[in-house]
């Protein structure tokens, strides 16, 4: 997170929300009729969902790069995917938020699969590798800058930012469920209070016997007890939901660390296997070179012996002719 004014940060999220509301009120634009199709396939799962074109996919990546920092700062990013869908509609591409999110996940999965592939093969198999790599590199630069400027909060921010990549697996916050529970408790208590008030007001004899002081004191005491009960129940639900959310987040973090360790182990094994293969190749080349040298030495020895014998025979013939 960059060190900008918190009021500007709040205003940025407010603009995104306002933009989404405006887009929901407008009629949807016509479908794009681009002819060039994305070789990676569409982000949807049904037959009626049109395939993603290359232009459409590039536009999605451009919008996702523009909002990447906001995605990393927001745990509940369902609203942000609505903003992405609205921006896609502005460009003439009609896609739902779920389709955009699914397409992004598929692209990230293919990007990770290309990390051990040769560069030439990457360009042929996955044409959007450079765009996604640019997004992740910009994210890493922001994290490094943030760690350099605010070291005291870097570790906490690191956990929060990396949790969004696994890419976009959301863990629901407890606030919404807690608020719904609190509203339910308030409505229930309100109905019970209305029933008690109605039953008391419909009996004039009982109302006449009670004094105003006693009635007001009882009402204040009942209201105080009700508010206390609601607050206590709210606190219990808050603690419970926060614990459940924390446990779920810790489980996902443990799973992520396991996957990362497994990936590193496999990469180390592949590197060792590659080094062993290279050593075996070098040993075979050395053996072949030694065999070639031995054969060359034998050939030279045979040639020398043959030449010496021919010279001796020639000298003997010449000597015999002299006699």
Curated annotation (Swiss-Prot):
Function of the protein: Probable transcription factor that binds specifically to the core DNA sequence 5'-GTTAC-3'.
Protein name: Trihelix transcription factor GT-3a
Main subcellular location of this protein, as a coarse class: nucleus
Location in or out of the cell: Nucleus
Subunit note: Homodimer. Heterodimer with GT-3B.
Taxonomy, superkingdom: Eukaryota
GO cellular component annotations of the record: nucleus
Start-end of Acidic residues biased regions: 164-176
Keyword DNA-binding listed: yes
Tissue specificity: Predominantly expressed in roots and flower buds.
Keyword terms: DNA-binding, Nucleus, Transcription, Transcription regulation
Domain Myb-like: start-end pairs: 52-108
Biased composition (Basic residues): 1-20
A Pfam short name: Myb_DNA-bind_4
Gene Ontology MF terms in the entry: DNA-binding transcription factor activity; identical protein binding; sequence-specific DNA binding; transcription cis-regulatory region binding
BP GO annotations: regulation of DNA-templated transcription
Source organism of the structure: Arabidopsis thaliana (Mouse-ear cress)
PANTHER family, per the entry: FI21293P1, TRIHELIX TRANSCRIPTION FACTOR GT-3A
